[in-house]
Amino acid sequence: MPPLATMSSPGSLLLLTPAVYQGIGRNRGGQSQEGQSISSSRSLKTKLSVSARAVSSCEASMRITCCANQTQTARRKSFSGPTSPPSGSVKEKVRSPKLDDGGTGFPPFRFGGGGGGGGGGGSNSAGGFILFVIVLLLDYLREFERNLQNGTRRGSDYDNGLAPQ
């Protein structure tokens, strides 16, 4: 008896024609098996039940294979870009980023004010000049203090004979 269905792999399934199914109840000579003994009818019933199970398992695997091969198309919403508001709505003014105008003041990364560029910090004052005056004052005070501490060791102008006459 030829097999009803063969499977080489789970994905491939070969089903046989209906003529093969009709030949199940006959032996090789084409004669009916009705006149044979009870044991042969049992084997025929066993073969039929086995073949029915094979066909049902083949159908189940075919359904699984068909389900596995189905695909689903995904639809992506297309981006339409920025849309304008309705004509009657209140429009907000679009602000551009605040750029450094090169004015006076602190550099733009710190303390705000948009300063940077130019000759030093401060609002309308010359900061560099004030710093220079402070440094000169500190230098003068340092020399004056040295003269007070070391004045007796070195002597004064009167001791060296450099006094005005």
Swiss-Prot record:
| Highest taxon, organism lineage | Eukaryota
Q: Where is the transit peptide?
A: 1-51
Q: In which tissues is it expressed?
A: Highly expressed in leaves. Expressed in leaf sheaths. Expressed at low levels in stems.
List UniProt keywords, sorted A-Z. Answer: Chloroplast, Plastid, Transit peptide
Give the lineage. Answer: Eukaryota, Viridiplantae, Streptophyta, Embryophyta, Tracheophyta
> What GO biological process terms does the UniProt entry carry, in alphabetical order?
chloroplast organization; chloroplast proton-transporting ATP synthase complex assembly; thylakoid membrane organization
Upon gene disruption, the observed phenotype is: Yellow-leaf phenotype due to reduced chlorophyll content.
User: Which species does this protein come from?
Assistant: Oryza sativa subsp. japonica
Region Disordered, residue ranges: 71-118
Q: Name one GO cellular component term.
A: chloroplast
Localization, per the record, is:
Plastid, Chloroplast
Official protein name in the record = Protein YELLOW LEAF 1, choloroplastic
Q: Its induction, per UniProt?
A: Induced by light in dark-grown seedllings.
The record's annotation in InterPro entries points to:
RF2K-like
